[in-house]
Regions:
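Glycine-rich phosphate-binding loops of nucleotide-dependent enzymes
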Residues: 2-281
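Long, low-complexity, intrinsically disordered segments
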Residues: 285-300
Length: 300
């Protein structure tokens, strides 16, 4: 929350064009401190374009941003980062053969000494890395081990802890669970809750409602560059979110159209079965989700 009780980050009427292609059209959303806003949509919905405008990679052609209640114009990623908007992309910007602590401070290396005798402060870097990861509930065996030896979920957690350490007020996570298995996705979701509990506004980009719903407080659904739905958690259950995301309504409508055209041919029946399978899958997957309660702190 801002000092006046409003959203930490607010986007109003953002549009972005690439020639004649409309990537975003009149998109509005907000992010509150200590909440997870889930930005959902299929491939090509406009999620990546929106986060690149939020993080300063692209400049919007229309609309405005308010950060902490003040109008902002992000001309570069550094502008956004200096205001406290940090983005963790899928590739994580890590070097696998470097140690965890070197990756943690990559680009912001701490030094000691002066003049020609200035050198990397290894002791501070290793101690800080271990301490910051511990605050997030991340237990690493050795800060000197190459970051490439960590699992995908552990590397994501290191990137999240790094952003938090360097003062992120808004943390944008670009599909952090997309390439992970069930167990490692659960690890990342737990650390997202940890960041939220530390008062950070989190934007969680995903195309998987089963990953978003357990941690989300607010859900914004994009479709073809426009906001298709905007709901608080208490307004929409997981089944409704899946229905909006997966096109269950479209499948059923198409089945009716085919039924009228082909007098109930096999294509219509197949589509109806697909819609029923989608509903059944909602229940079975929900049973495998990580716990929705607060994540354990550093002490377990």
């Amino acid at each position: 929350m801002t000092s006046n009780g409003g959203p930490l980050l607010e986007v109003k009427g953002i549009s972005k064009y690439f020639g004649s292609v409309i990537a975003l059209k009149d998109v509005s959303m907000f992010v509150r401190a200590g909440e997870v806003t889930c930005l959902l949509g299929d491939n090509g919905a406009g999620k990546s374009t929106l986060i690149k405008t939020l993080s300063g990679v692209y400049r919007a052609d229309e609309g405005e941003y308010l950060f902490d209640g003040e109008p902002m114009d992000f001309r570069s990623p550094r502008d956004a980062l200096e205001r406290g908007i940090a983005t963790v992309y899928q590739d994580l910007a890590m070097i696998p053969l470097l140690s965890i602590w070197r990756n943690f401070f990559l680009g912001s290396e701490p030094t000691k000494g002066w003049g020609p005798f200035r050198r990397y402060d290894v002791e501070y870097a290793t101690a800080t890395t271990r301490d910051e990861l511990g605050k997030m509930g991340i237990d690493i065996r050795d800060p000197d081990q190459p970051v490439g030896t960590l699992s995908g979920g552990e590397r994501q957690s290191v990137a999240i802890a790094r952003a938090v350490h360097f003062g992120a007020k808004v943390l944008i996570l670009d599909e952090p669970t997309a390439s992970l298995g069930v167990k490692q996705a659960g690890v990342v979701l737990r650390y997202i809750v940890q960041a939220k509990q530390r008062g950070i506004g989190v934007i969680f980009i995903s195309h998987n409602p089963h990953h978003a719903y357990p941690v989300g407080d607010h859900f914004v659904i994009l479709r073809r560059g426009q906001v298709y739905g905007d709901f608080a958690r208490e307004e929409l259950g997981l089944e409704g979110l899946v229905q909006m995301m997966a096109g269950g309504e479209e499948l059923e409508n198409l089945a009716h159209e085919l039924e009228r055209a082909a007098a109930g041919g096999t294509a219509a029946e197949d589509l109806r079965k697909a819609a029923a399978l989608l509903e059944a899958e909602t229940g079975t997957r929900e049973d495998r989700e990580p716990p929705q309660g607060p994540a354990p702190g550093p002490g377990g």
